[in-house]
């Protein structure tokens, strides 16, 4: 569930099962069905700031696309090149959060994801110093020990923490090729491999595809589970 418009505003929906609560239709409000939320925003807004104003007047409802397609329980990340927000429709109503991490995964709610980052505030890309005991001559025995304790499992909270850390410390060159390459390395740190996350007998959750967008040039980059080669599509050259 991801899309981007010609102005460089991008939006993605991620699973929020058990927490998403859509509202009933209200007179006098801009009632928007969950399945049309992304195109409703991207067809009218050029920036996060414009979207915030529209969200204040919107009522997100659970109208289904068709009887066989119930409303997907999602929360959303919305970003341009200057700002990023998270949008959640919960029992208390529509919540809009500034997202300084620039990251979103599935459940739990965004505020809880951000709070859990407090557990990792001691982590660093630098080698650690011995604060355990002045009486013990402790030394590092491997590179990367400053990030010892960074989650590596495939749960959404662990993936949120790991990709937030990776994004915060990843270093890229100035060229577009270097930036795109580094982006795919960042998301690759939380790839899901077939067989490691079983959701039913013989069925596994995998990273089907990974994508990013050059907001200034309108170029969409992606690769897939079966093909790691990065493909570039210049949307301004396509018949849309």
Where do the model's predicted regions map?
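Short hydrophobic/aromatic-rich beta-strand segments that constitute the beta-sheet cores
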Residues: 11-13, 96, 220-223
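Structural recognition of the beta-strand scaffold that forms the well-ordered cores
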Residues: 10-13, 77-79, 86, 212
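Short, surface-exposed beta-strand-loop junctions and turns on beta-sheet-rich folds
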Residues: 17-19, 92-95, 102, 226-230
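Aromatic- and glycine-enriched pocket-lining scaffold segments that form the walls
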Residues: 48, 52-89
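Proteins synthesized as precursors that undergo proteolytic processing into mature forms
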Residues: 28-64, 176-185
